[in-house]
Amino acid sequence: MKLYAVCVYLFLYIPIGIIALFSFNAGRHASQMQGFSVKWYGKTLSNPFVMDALENSLIVAFTSALCASVFGTMAAVALQGIKGPMRTAFDMLIYIAVMIPGIVIGIATLIGLVTVFDQLNPLLAVLWPEGFTPPKLRMGMGSLIAAHTMFLMALVVIIVRARLAGMDRSLIEASSDLYATPMATFRQVTLPMIFPAILAGFLLSFTFSFDDFIIAFFVAGSETTLPIYVFSSIRRGVTPEINAIGTMVLGVSLLLLITAQLLLQRGGHKSR
């Protein structure tokens, strides 16, 4: 069994190690090591197309993670007061949202937004004052942020609800006994207890949004995120520059995931 586990881990991580190794290749060929160099990292960071795509990815990831953290936390707290069959139904919907393949979410979001835009654009043209050009709703950063927020909300709900379930309910009861209002109890008791989980949900949401290609491919419109740029570049061949981008993204993602895990562990110790 141990040998099987080792083989599985090698199968998963050897390709990642190869990408990291060849990102330091001095030559242009991605499959032939010709010395050690960090020049591809410099070229990557000086490439304006990469920087524009990186900026878009950071904006989308931060905004989506922030919205998902706020709305997901609100939903998790609200679900605490629901019991019985309705609670089971909501739980099922949340887990289904996490399990749905990204391609399904991308196609469904694309169809939904196109339908809404087709209905609203003529209405805006009629209602907009004469002499001014009415705005035209189209695919872009807004649609991408909306799609990622809807997908990531379920993830935040699961993380925050797990922390809420592990909270010491006597603290909330003590706050009520001291005549604290529900809002004061949430602000001074509940929120500090679940904040590590909220922050962990934010970091995980940021990571998933930053790395996402499938949903972004459908709803980004003319905008280019870093995963879309990498996909377009790979179609022309793998280069050390692509390896450098992959290595940097991998490093940032691992750092965020480790930080999120530490926050969850810290929150678990505090709730006890």
Task: Map each language-model feature to its residues.
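Short membrane-interfacial helix/loop motifs at transmembrane-helix boundaries
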Residues: I14-P48, V219-G221, R272
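Hydrophobic alpha-helical transmembrane segments of multipass integral membrane proteins
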Residues: E55, I59-F71, A75, R187, ...
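C-terminal transmembrane helix and the adjacent membrane-cytosol boundary/short C-terminal tail
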Residues: M1-L3, K83-M86, R161-S176, F186-Q188, ...
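Membrane-embedded alpha-helices of multi-pass transport/permease systems
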Residues: I14-G17, L21, V70-A75, I107, ...
